[in-house]
Amino acid sequence: MHLATFTDGSIPPCCVGEPTSASMNNTIHIKDAWNNQELKDIRKALINDEPVFNCSQCYRDEQCGVNSHRKQSNDFYYRMYKDDIDRALDNVQDDGTMLIDPFTLDIRAGNTCNLKCIMCRPNESSKWFNDAKKILDVTGNDVVRRDWNNKININTQNFAWVEREEFWEDFKELVPTLKEIIFGGGEPFLSKSINNLIKYMVDTGHSSHIKIRFHTNGTTIPESFWELVDEFKEIELLFSIDGFDQQNYYVRNPAEWEPIVKNLYLADKTKANAMILFSVHSLSAYNIVDLYKWRMSQPFKRLNNIPIVLGRVYHPDYLNPQGLPQVVKDKIHTRIMNFIDEHKNNYPNGYFDSLEENANWIMDSSKDNLDALVDYIESLDKVRTTSFDETFPEYSEIINNARQ
């Protein structure tokens, strides 16, 4: 039922899975990729309830007692599309060939982006390449150097697939039977092809049966988009925000706060379902409370009714918050739990469940990566003339004390 791509055209089973060897760069048509041998083998394994290597991260989460992306998606999509999924299962041949087209797509359409978020790399953002070279010049840590030597080693031709007319023509052929599309990037609103496809779906009348979810940094949504929201069955906007104001500027550099807030309010006034997506990593975890407090202080009509969506950062290891020293993790956990205790009676039961689950997830043991993290922070500050100490004074003090 589902076909996903990463920015470089590689094809995973889903957005958090390990990529297969299949790629939009070595196939001409979407339907060829859809029944690639590796995807057929994955289908056979899943139908037979056999483990799949590409799903390893979710299996590890489940062993830690975490409600994994795999389980959440299985539950959610089966509730949403039970009849369609049952029909898809009836149309899988013994060799894994799927006889019907995908009806949900997750397309990360290239790496074109206007930001250079600290947990991204050139593969996810075209803006990262110059900073990546500079970090290699200033880092004094072998872990950071190895990490960025790997990240900077990309083939820019791997992003050419999003410029191929054949891909977007194939996409249009799927539109009549599509039910849901996820657009990420890069920054999807910078893609002319995506903007043209949105208009095509409206002009052909197919927008009425399609739900679209955008993963956006919220800085560059065109004014014309808001005029089309009502044309679709549903629009979801996941605003990737990792802190309040200057905190977000530091993490999602150089994201200005004013256009993000403006677009949050514009979304709140439409029928679009707007949510904030917060990436939980070593630099952001302590300050998620600040973003919650800011949002609570704002007179949003609908946005405050929806818990902040939390995404975990596992790689690189030095950005995985589980790799922080125990004393730092204790501080993070205490701050989050105190915040929940202070506010839980003002919100429905379950509103803070995900926040509490992530606070507990951080406490799980992992290798101490503080030296690499501190070197990465210092390297970023040198390259970008930013200041971690000034942006995160309280958290900076906690980290510095942990080093002594």
What are these regions (language model features)?
Residues 31, 56, 117, 172, ...:
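Non-transmembrane alpha-helical segments in soluble domains
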Residues 31-32, 42-44, 117, 121, ...:
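A generic structured-segment signal
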